[in-house]
Amino acid sequence: MSILEHASLMTDEIRRVPLEELQTRLARFREEMEKEHPGWQMAVINNKVNMYYFTGTMQEGALVIRPQDEILWVRRSYDRARNESLLPDIRPMQSFRTLAEFYGTWPDVMYVECRKATVDWLNMLRKYMPFKEYADIDGLLCSLRLVKSSYELELMKRSGAIHQTVLEQLAPKMIKEGISEAELAVSLYTEMLKRGSHGIARMNLPLGEDVIGVASFGKSGLVRTAFDGPGGTGGTCIAVQSIGSPFRKLKAGRLVYLDIPCGVEGYHTDKTIVYYFGDINKDPNRDLILAAHEHCIMLERFAAAMLKPGTVVEDIYNETMKQFDSRFAAGFMNGGKFLGHSIGLTMDESPAIANRFKEVLTEGMTFALEPKIALSGIGMVGSENTYLVTANGGKALTGSPHKLYCIY
């Protein structure tokens, strides 16, 4: 395929973020900046997720926003940025020197994404744009992304539909004796790609990295990882704490823990489902396994019912934990102190459903609820689904939690 043919293919087949969507986001950004930082003069967006949120493209460069204008400066790839983004003002840059020559003068305070910016990037920015100090806007950006538009929700609904189809309808057909954790995870991931998943799970956490998610059989689900989540895996090797082992094969009498991410055009949904391979009635731990799993289902449903406008986030956690059966305390969330998390352009958006989070819910927010219990010597049970905050409580986007199904 020639370069011209490739360019034509991109133009014909990509689905751009609508201009009115970008304009609304930029207007909300300026409104919130004026509230929190009256008199602000300039902000520089460098993180690719935030760049995508405001411009509809992910490139190496900088989005410079001022009260009167916004310009997307692109080092690489300028042509791709022009093709993908409907933002009117997109310009090429060689380095920050290009910006220095264009703007000429600088505010005393530059607003940047401190959590994502490297020291090297900040030093380079300050070298060519000698502002006196910088201030953080990560919290402001997070709050903007928290409430989803109808456009964003449509993408999440599409992702949720893929999630439900693959993990509820297709997974039982793939779970067979002798399959490895890695093979099962990859097979599920492939089915998601076929149906339109964008193929990656983006994280806010610096150490967060994931593509396929996790498939764990039995006790391997108890192996804790560096990632701040309840589910575990031995991974493919020491260097990769994800996917699952290519050598651990499924045998009868094991729990099958599946936490496989999905997303459409940048927007994610989160879902975990647990199956039992074999006849659970022959398992000496049958009653414990079923009781723990059903308890997680109850907790998820209870928390989901509280996902209404006006509810304080920490109240969801505290009220749900009042329903918690203390006999499962040792393994609940594998030691974590949360029930779920906001989700959208990244899997682990803030706030978490946990104590001391004071945010008040509004319609359009989306959360993943994931009560899970680690059963010592057995494996992980529980559930996870993504919900939309509505006046009637959480509306499931990925399907509802269900009982533990046995696969023979």
What are these model-predicted stretches?
Residues 1-408:
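Active-site neighborhoods and metal-handling regions in enzymes and metal-associated proteins
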